[in-house]
Amino acid sequence: IVTLDEIASQLEVSNTPVREAFQQLIYEGFLAQQRNRRVEVLSIGPKFIRDHFEARAIMEKSCAALACKRATEEDFKEMKRINEKSIKAMQKGDMTVYTRCNYDLHHAIWTAAGNDKLIKMLSDMWNGLAVERLITVEEYAQIAQLSFDEHQEILRLIFARDAKQAETAMECHIMRSCENMLEYQKGQKQKSEQN
């Protein structure tokens, strides 16, 4: 449990930016508000992870289906541009660039869906919990190839305007990411128990 004043003092900033950060972290489920301006740091357990990815899967599969119906030629060009960049990143083994392409590609699909509310909610969720920020580069490289392959299939289906199959492929992609995160967390827990 920490207080707003303690954190502001440690960071040598006013309370305002810390309060705003706390509010965002409370909204995202990382902190819980206590009495007397105190907050409790919540652990990220399996339920939190599953809830996060299930919500993302529901929204992202809808975006994939909507993108099949609403995507313009400009949207397709943007997705192809990002995909080409991700292909080059994978060939070079550049996980930093691939990570950015991963986000950019998902965002391009959300944009092609044409629903501003979904874009906002998914952007907020993406910034809250991302597998690649919690694992090493080597570990991410192992799952990046699978992610890349899934992206190729999702794009193929969106370009073919096959809404039903694109929706299914996106849901599988997101839930596979969930399983990766749960496996990683389980492994981390086992490592800490051995030490």
Predicted features along the sequence, with ranges:
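Amphipathic alpha-helical packing segments from all-alpha helical-bundle domains
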Residues: T96-R100, K120, Q145
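A ubiquitous short alpha-helical element
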Residues: I44-R50, A64-T72, A89-G93, L134-A141
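Amphipathic alpha-helical effector-binding/dimerization core
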Residues: R100-Y103, A112-I119
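Short, charge-rich, low-complexity alpha-helical interaction segments
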Residues: K47-R50, L118-M125
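Alpha-helical structural segments
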Residues: Q24, E28-G29, K47, D51, ...
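Short linear motifs at protein or domain termini
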Residues: I1-A65, K69, C178, L182-N195
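C-terminal all-alpha effector/ligand-binding and dimerization domain
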Residues: K61, K80-I87, K92, D104, ...
